[in-house]
């Protein structure tokens, strides 16, 4: 099997590049640049203003009109040639990497990975949060490891919503207007040489979808788009908005993803060895493959069993109520045209979507996926246990735990990365478990001065970025020049800084810190040992309680007592997240156990030597080692949620008062917190391998992909 799959595309737009710089187009139209800082530095050098505004190489190429000065700049030309040579080497030498070296030709085709969202970089905003960022990191790591891999998703021209917080703390919703020609997207080309389009039959009409390609290193990501002239005006918006509120529109999206995604691969001549469903949104791809086999003369049972053998499923939600469900009558109505045309028994298909609660009026996407895949996993060891207990009545095979990881080259900050590289570390090539011991050894060798200075550099970057964001935010609220001027003094790097940043679902308890306002105010405003806290996060437009949590935090941030010490940054995205995980001292996470399936933001923080303070849930249940962070509460939650909330808040305050604040402000003769630095080393050393996507993907290959490909 070739080490990567090549999908033919239409040519990149003509940016009138001189022949000596034509390689810039190859760089711009491959998301490789999103995790290789040297490429980003190259494009920033071409036009810093455009780069800072858009963070997109395509935007830089579109804006550039005169290349003469760059052609005559020998330093730039050397930089360009070096970057291009490294990129070409990366793309051409997959057989040097883990999959080819360890597993050779064990797969007869690629892994086809389906997900509703992908977080690759903020300039391509087709993600909402952790699921999409995980999918993006999964693709990047598959590329780095030269795993034969193709990903499938949807192109959301309006993206996920943009968040503003008004002067009263209410969340406001706006949307993008993404234009493909301004993004690193090219149309896939079918074997006839025409731009690829697929179709799905729905009641009374055919819906068409264009197929775009976002190249992610060696991995092609196919994105389906219904906003095409062939469609009725009522169908063009199907793929416009990620997690659109209307249930019927959402079901249309998931049919396009599952059914259309399979058809896109077929049209492009891709024959996957394994099919991976990342969450249940794409479960109709299983029905579509069964339909293909029924049309070839197989019985439905035989067809489903054949599909099942080569399909694997990752479940992300611990409780049944959090899984995707649709009205069974609506599913019947929308799938009837395809089912009737193929002779499939729609009642059998609907029965396989019966959830754990036995409610036949609902079609449960997770239940359907579990029944029709041969291997399934939760996204942490604890989540695997919880999922097994929840879904045992549904399936006859265990749900294993494969703990999520994150992609270190994407998430480790420049200063911390340099510290590791100065000691021989290489985040771009961590391909064996030997790296686990090497990272421990390297972190133990980092001098106090180097580690502390790197951390303060990343805190300074956060301060600069947050000041700009907050000033823009408060100016929109009509704050005075005096108040806006005071923002110059916020987020002092010499003050203990805590962050809580994630989706504002109520089970995550974002406002737990304010359970006892008087006590936390005393802690935060202590004149000798103050604390500053930065919040960020979105609540889904339909989640009114989550939006209420945002308003509560906002009101505390603008209160007389806490103003200037508590902040909430609006429009949480990958860029905000990078600055926070790289630039704070403590990463706070306090969900209700066991409702946090994984929680990868804490892993990103730990890799930057930021210390976690968290409930023992998700990844932290296995990642906590007593000396690499702090655990809030224990492992036996009280069924009385109010009592548990209060108990967790009290333990959080105790840890701050008795351990965290004293340790941070305990300085040696050089002004450095020695005990804190020791814990920082352990935080990074215990996460850089154990919670990397490299480790994660090795487990997917050996525990899921290869067994499924072999029919085991």
Which role fits each region the language model picked out?
Residues 1-712:
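Catalytic cores of carbohydrate-active enzymes across secretory and cytosolic contexts
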